[in-house]
Amino acid sequence: MKALLLSAYDAESHRLWRHNLQAMFPLIQWHELTLPARYFPWRVRGNSLSWAFNHRATLTDNYDFLLTTSMTDLSALRGFVPALARLPTAVYCHENQFAYPVNPDPRAPRPNPVEPQMLSLYTALCADQLVFNSAYNRETFLQGVAELLSKLPDHVPAGLVERLQHARVIPVPLSEDVFAPASRSIDASEADVLNIVWNHRWEYDKGPALLLAIVEELIASGLRFRLHLLGQRFRQAPAPLQQLQALLERHCAALGIEPGHSGYIADRQSYCQLLASADVALSTALHDFQGLSLLEATALGCTPLAPRRLVYPEYLGPEFLYDTTGDNGEETAAEAHTAVQRLRDWAQRKALGQTLPKADVQRFRQSSLQADYAALLHALTASQVTARQNTDNTPAEG
């Protein structure tokens, strides 16, 4: 079996998805086209142009099905390469543009969100199989589509949202390496130090202002803790994260604590080892449709702590969630305080030699999701067989 896989904005989570998918189905001949995750407005509007005129030979080869991410401008790509319209097609949605928070920085550009929203709608309508990584992603997408269509002036087709409601939910599978048993020995001298990891992109949508508020209250409370600031960095880091680094350095120096790691860890094994040594994985996100960073840390033994919003209540119990002001992501002292209360409680448990609560994320491993992805691929190939049979049974003209 031969498949074409398109990833139009190949961010780290998108790469993890396609790599794990190929590991799950090694007998399929996968042929990939990807584009770097940068220049977002150009990438989502121009990917069809880039591929159609730079990679036509790859696009017009013989395939059994097409699997593409929702960032692909599939309707335009089919117009440029009509042969693609004959392939059974699955569209995988890692995120949607309807539930993306606005950057609070007044200096940040304010792109018009309608164009990427419309492009994602066109691509979804092209799909024979539409798949989301979480129910939260699916519901916010459908709600966003309905709201967008209600604002359009005229000639809006009826029933578009209903056409999309058949969409499946299949999460991005976690690599099997994060489920390998790891030794979590605790240094006696570290028993009173809570090891916290924040492993997210250094961008505004990951809630750096709330993270700063949490750290400020933790320091004011006198808690002995270490915070590892991981995740991808970019040329301009949000101001709260810049303040945070200096604050943490002073905190660790004052208490004689070895500072946590700060910065992206490119080596996968080293990254997993650090996560496996931490006590708590903290999220302050304003935007997460699955939360792969938190899931990986949880699989490696960290106790997760996340806001009670976005996708997190789908797979974390109430003991792992702190109260928030809602999905608007407004950072408040009360919001930080609820997270700090939980962290102080867990620090006390650790100091007493007690085990911290653990969340079960086994359902996200490759082996657990294999059957769901197999059913998806079977549905695609079955639709191809049906189409071929219908073609074979069509009477010849003349």
Regions found by a protein language model. Give the residues of each.
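A charged, aromatic-enriched C-terminal amphipathic alpha-helix characteristic of glycosyltransferases
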Residues: 42-46, 330-338, 345-384
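Donor nucleotide-sugar binding/catalytic pocket of nucleotide-sugar-dependent glycosyltransferases
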Residues: 126-185
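Conserved donor-binding/catalytic core segment of Leloir-type glycosyltransferases
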Residues: 187-206, 212-217, 227-230
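Glycosyltransferase donor-sugar binding loop
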Residues: 212, 226-243, 261-264
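Nucleotide-activated donor-binding/catalytic signature segment of Leloir-type glycosyltransferases, i.e.
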Residues: 241-269
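Short alpha-helical donor nucleotide-sugar binding micro-motif in glycosyltransferases
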Residues: 272-278
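Aromatic "clamp/platform" in nucleotide-sugar-dependent glycosyltransferases that forms part
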Residues: 286
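Short hydrophobic beta-strand element within catalytic cores of glycosyltransferases
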Residues: 303-306
